[in-house]
Amino acid sequence: MGGISIWQLLIIVAIIVLLFGTKKLRTLGTDLGESVKGFKKAMNEDEPKDAEFKSLNKDESATAGSEKVKDKEQA
């Protein structure tokens, strides 16, 4: 009733293909896909940096614990 049927969607797609042509739509899809891949790659590159900080924090806590033991031994 108020929604768009499959036939209406097919007509809209056919009009878009006629207006822009398949070659232009293909290049547009390729450009869009490459930009999404680049965005995902940039998001994945940020994650290991966070992991490095977490590992540094663990190392610092281990050295802080050993320093406390040394302080107790000296006292």
Curated annotation (Swiss-Prot):
Ranges where the record places region Disordered: 50-75
Bilayer disposition of the protein: Single-pass membrane protein
Pfam short name (any one): TatA_B_E
GO biological process terms on file: protein transport by the Tat complex
Main location: membrane
Subcellular location: Cell inner membrane
GO cellular component, one term: TAT protein transport complex
Family matches, as InterPro entries: TatA/B/E, TatA/E
Protein keywords: Cell inner membrane, Cell membrane, Membrane, Protein transport, Translocation, Transmembrane, Transmembrane helix, Transport
Transmembrane spans: 1-21
Record GO terms (molecular function): protein transmembrane transporter activity
UniProt xrefs under PANTHER family: SEC-INDEPENDENT PROTEIN TRANSLOCASE PROTEIN TATA
Family: Belongs to the TatA/E family.
Function, in words: Part of the twin-arginine translocation (Tat) system that transports large folded proteins containing a characteristic twin-arginine motif in their signal peptide across membranes. TatA could form the protein-conducting channel of the Tat system.
Subunit structure: The Tat system comprises two distinct complexes: a TatABC complex, containing multiple copies of TatA, TatB and TatC subunits, and a separate TatA complex, containing only TatA subunits. Substrates initially bind to the TatABC complex, which probably triggers association of the separate TatA complex to form the active translocon.
Protein known as: Sec-independent protein translocase protein TatA
